[in-house]
């Protein structure tokens, strides 16, 4: 089956949106049959919180994203969950706009890296909704 992303085809111009940006980036990079929500409770790190060791490559994407947000908060005094930024989805990649070192660019780069990582990583069904108390120590 061929999946055509209308977002990519339309070449939507840059726009600031906050957390919705990250969801849109994820939708752009993941397989067509998946929804961004399927990544919200996956492994030890995809979703709220996180502990233990990532259980696979996809979970490692979330682990790296969590740490990226943590660095943005601690080192740069940014608020990643509410930070607006501008980006463009084009030609199967994501372009972040803004000056390097600004909160907008830092957060966009965190989200971009994670979304592209999601697109490159295998989604293993049995790692969704796992017992984190048992598997994430």
Swiss-Prot record:
<keyword id="KW-0442">Lipid degradation</keyword>
<dbReference type="GO" id="GO:0050482">
    <property type="term" value="P:arachidonate secretion"/>
</dbReference>
<feature type="active site">
    <location>
        <position position="111"/>
    </location>
</feature>
<feature type="disulfide bond">
    <location>
        <begin position="78"/>
        <end position="103"/>
    </location>
</feature>
<dbReference type="InterPro" id="IPR016090">
    <property type="entry name" value="PLipase_A2_dom"/>
</dbReference>
<dbReference type="GO" id="GO:0005509">
    <property type="term" value="F:calcium ion binding"/>
</dbReference>
<dbReference type="InterPro" id="IPR033113">
    <property type="entry name" value="PLipase_A2_His_AS"/>
</dbReference>
<keyword id="KW-0106">Calcium</keyword>
<dbReference type="GO" id="GO:0016042">
    <property type="term" value="P:lipid catabolic process"/>
</dbReference>
<comment type="function">
    <text>Snake venom phospholipase A2 (PLA2) that shows presynaptic neurotoxicity. The A chain has phospholipase activity. PLA2 catalyzes the calcium-dependent hydrolysis of the 2-acyl groups in 3-sn-phosphoglycerides.</text>
</comment>
<keyword id="KW-0528">Neurotoxin</keyword>
<keyword id="KW-0479">Metal-binding</keyword>
<keyword id="KW-0732">Signal</keyword>
<dbReference type="GO" id="GO:0090729">
    <property type="term" value="F:toxin activity"/>
</dbReference>
<dbReference type="GO" id="GO:0005576">
    <property type="term" value="C:extracellular region"/>
</dbReference>
<dbReference type="Pfam" id="PF00068">
    <property type="entry name" value="Phospholip_A2_1"/>
</dbReference>
<protein>
    <recommendedName>
        <fullName>Basic phospholipase A2 beta-bungarotoxin A1 chain</fullName>
        <ecNumber>3.1.1.4</ecNumber>
    </recommendedName>
</protein>
<comment type="subunit">
    <text>Heterodimer; disulfide-linked. The A chain has phospholipase A2 activity and the B chain shows homology with the basic protease inhibitors.</text>
</comment>
<feature type="disulfide bond">
    <location>
        <begin position="68"/>
        <end position="110"/>
    </location>
</feature>
<feature type="binding site">
    <location>
        <position position="49"/>
    </location>
    <ligand>
        <name>Ca(2+)</name>
    </ligand>
</feature>
<dbReference type="GO" id="GO:0006644">
    <property type="term" value="P:phospholipid metabolic process"/>
</dbReference>
<feature type="disulfide bond">
    <location>
        <begin position="61"/>
        <end position="117"/>
    </location>
</feature>
<comment type="similarity">
    <text>Belongs to the phospholipase A2 family. Group I subfamily. D49 sub-subfamily.</text>
</comment>
<feature type="binding site">
    <location>
        <position position="47"/>
    </location>
    <ligand>
        <name>Ca(2+)</name>
    </ligand>
</feature>
<keyword id="KW-0638">Presynaptic neurotoxin</keyword>
<dbReference type="InterPro" id="IPR033112">
    <property type="entry name" value="PLipase_A2_Asp_AS"/>
</dbReference>
<feature type="binding site">
    <location>
        <position position="45"/>
    </location>
    <ligand>
        <name>Ca(2+)</name>
    </ligand>
</feature>
<feature type="propeptide">
    <location>
        <begin position="10"/>
        <end position="17"/>
    </location>
</feature>
<keyword id="KW-1015">Disulfide bond</keyword>
<dbReference type="InterPro" id="IPR001211">
    <property type="entry name" value="PLipase_A2"/>
</dbReference>
<feature type="disulfide bond">
    <location>
        <begin position="44"/>
        <end position="136"/>
    </location>
</feature>
<feature type="disulfide bond">
    <location>
        <begin position="46"/>
        <end position="62"/>
    </location>
</feature>
<feature type="signal peptide">
    <location>
        <begin position="1"/>
        <end position="9"/>
    </location>
</feature>
<feature type="disulfide bond">
    <location>
        <begin position="96"/>
        <end position="108"/>
    </location>
</feature>
<keyword id="KW-0800">Toxin</keyword>
<keyword id="KW-0964">Secreted</keyword>
<feature type="binding site">
    <location>
        <position position="66"/>
    </location>
    <ligand>
        <name>Ca(2+)</name>
    </ligand>
</feature>
<keyword id="KW-0443">Lipid metabolism</keyword>
<dbReference type="GO" id="GO:0047498">
    <property type="term" value="F:calcium-dependent phospholipase A2 activity"/>
</dbReference>
<dbReference type="GO" id="GO:0005543">
    <property type="term" value="F:phospholipid binding"/>
</dbReference>
<feature type="active site">
    <location>
        <position position="65"/>
    </location>
</feature>
<keyword id="KW-0378">Hydrolase</keyword>
């Amino acid at each position: 089956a061929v999946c055509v992303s209308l977002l990519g085809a339309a070449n939507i111009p840059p726009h600031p949106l906050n957390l919705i940006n990250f969801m849109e980036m994820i939708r752009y990079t993941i397989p067509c049959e998946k929804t961004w929500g399927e990544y919200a409770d996956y492994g030890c790190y995809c979703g709220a919180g996180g502990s233990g060791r990532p259980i696979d490559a996809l979970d490692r994407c979330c682990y790296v994203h969590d740490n990226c947000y943590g660095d943005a908060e601690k080192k740069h005094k940014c608020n990643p969950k509410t930070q607006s930024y501008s980006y463009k989805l084009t030609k199967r990649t994501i372009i972040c706009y803004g000056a390097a070192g600004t909160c907008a660019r830092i957060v966009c780069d965190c989200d971009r890296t994670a979304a592209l990582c999601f697109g490159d990583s295998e989604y293993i069904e049995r790692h969704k909704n796992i017992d984190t108390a048992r598997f994430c120590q």
